[in-house]
Amino acid sequence: MLKSTQVILIFILLISIVESLSWLALGLAANRFDRDKPGTSCKSLKGLTRRQMRFCKKNIDLMESVRSGSLAAHAECQFQFHKRRWNCTLIDPVTHEVIPDVFLYENTRESAFVHAISSAAVAYKVTRDCARGISERCGCDYSKNDHSGKSQFQYQGCSDNVKFGIGVSKEFVDSAQRRVLMMKDDNGTSLLGPSQLSADGMHMINLHNNQAGRQVLEKSLRRECKCHGMSGSCEMRTCWDSLPNFRHIGMAIKDKFDGAAEVKVVKEDGIEKPRIVMKNSQFKRHTNADLVYMTPSPDFCESDPLRGILGTKGRQCTLAPNAIDDCSLLCCGRGYEKKVQIVEEKCNCKFIYCCEVRCEPCQKRIEKYLCL
């Protein structure tokens, strides 16, 4: 029988796990951030933990970048998964709250991707906005600028300040992983036992995937240069470090999703902190840059509201055997129906001098295939 203290602490642990992604609802908040009234602006936001609320009040000038990051993360997730059974439906556009995707809190592959992409997106938006001068506390990274003239190129201009962006992401995004300290009785035994280890393991894996996403961002920095010299001889180049389009980062994290490592969390005697290890010890150990997960993903075929799974009924599919959204795969063997839609479009357009464009109305037949 669990004691009342254990029940309360287990409840707190579960709440902290559920809150780990709720801040993504920031992207749909309608209000703007008033720098003169940080308390009012932050209190009106949904989904923030207490630590994130404190961050908001102290760093109101960065919150627009954080919100842009949540939007970018959601958009990129939907792009990468729009043809799959789980299409990254995360936020309810009516309530502006994160849909309770329970499976995301079970440390699945999908959870790993969402944590990594959201962490990277916040760092990305803060970094780019710093270069635009949105905050007096950050700007370009001039640390690499070289004025010695010894090399064939010189770092000059505005390099993206990735270190600052990563620091903000780590402080804001990682703070959602609230930790409840291990509580022990007089004999040194954990009051929560396996529940504590399980919750600690979930937090550790979420933090690992957050960091993996930021590593992808940092490694994506590329050097851009401009040539100087007579007749384009490029005798001297001035260079700066710049981040690519966020789509490039999203694709890199998606590749890591495809190769994610299945792990488990173990607590060894004499070592206070649990460790993340490969579930199958015969496989090569994961690295800090790999995405990791503990729970195999559901098949997402049937609707399961209690777990936040929408199912694939009514989803549009294609008749392409090798495609991810092929009807036989997306519809989970339930079959599909064909719907024909006639739409009117403009065609045979001609330019009439002067200055008019005349078109003829045309009907176009569109066939759609929907999962049963």
Swiss-Prot record:
Recorded phenotype for the gene knockout or disruption: Defective ALM, BDU and QR neuroblast migration and irregular HSN and CP axon growth and guidance. Double knockout with cwn-2 results in ALM and CAN migration defects. Double knockout with either cwn-2 or egl-20 results in HSN migration defects. Triple knockout with cwn-2 and cfz-2 results in enhanced neuronal cell migratory defects.
Disulfide linkage: 77-88, 130-138, 140-158, 225-239, 227-234, 301-332, 317-327, 331-371, 347-362, 349-359, 354-355
Keywords: Cell membrane, Cytoplasm, Developmental protein, Disulfide bond, Extracellular matrix, Glycoprotein, Lipoprotein, Membrane, Neurogenesis, Secreted, Signal, Wnt signaling pathway
Annotated SMART domains: WNT1 (SM00097)
GO cellular component: cytoplasm; extracellular space; plasma membrane
A molecular function (GO) term: cytokine activity
Membrane topology term: Peripheral membrane protein
O-palmitoleoyl serine lipid sites: 231
Modification comment: Palmitoleoylation is required for efficient binding to frizzled receptors. Depalmitoleoylation leads to Wnt signaling pathway inhibition.
Glycosylation sites: 87, 187
Family stated for the protein in its record: Belongs to the Wnt family.
Biological role: Ligand for members of the frizzled family of seven transmembrane receptors. Probable developmental protein. May be a signaling molecule which affects the development of discrete regions of tissues. Is likely to signal over only few cell diameters. Binds receptor tyrosine kinase cam-1. Together with Wnt ligand cwn-2, regulates the migration of CAN, ALM, BDU and HSN neurons during embryogenesis, the migration of QL and QR neuroblast descendants during larval development, and polarity of ALM neurons. Also acts with the Wnt ligand egl-20 to direct HSN neuron migration.
UniProt protein name: Protein Wnt-1
